[in-house]
């Protein structure tokens, strides 16, 4: 027989409505007088799906990434990339932006409010390969361009990722 304190997975629905059942339970057990809850006034439909989690022996101490079609895509910030950058920040892993962006890259970063996310911004000329700017062998490279990833992989020998592959990097156990 198993005895354990736990909450039902479906209680996430009530949290989405603004009612935190575990918190209410703690309040009741601490002697608080709870005679009402404060649900929010909107509709919520819950869809429960599988969540991918990965185990891997990959290790890196620096991230190099592209800007166009990687950090931004179709006129919007790539929220998965931004989430990955935030996780890197939490783990003190520097993120270096390597870009051949047409126009004023610093202004564009400022307009998106993401200037401070990068430890270094390299606005490159189109003639130099990105691998020329990658000095740390214990790093990874993220770019939407297969050609860029291939060139970096061959020149530097580090793991390379297409932007949609960051799900793997975000959902690694222990990261």
Predicted regions mapped to residue ranges:
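Conserved metal-phosphate-binding beta-hairpin within the catalytic cores
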Residues: 1-9
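Hydrophobic anchor at the start of a short beta-strand
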Residues: 95, 139, 158-160
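Short, acidic/turn-prone active-site loops that include or flank metal/cofactor-
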Residues: 122-128, 146-147, 163-170
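Conserved Lys-Pro-Asp/Glu-containing loop-to-beta segment of HAD-superfamily phosphomonoesterases
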Residues: 129-147, 152
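Acidic, PIN/NYN-like endoribonuclease modules and their adjacent C-terminal/linker elements
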Residues: 154-175
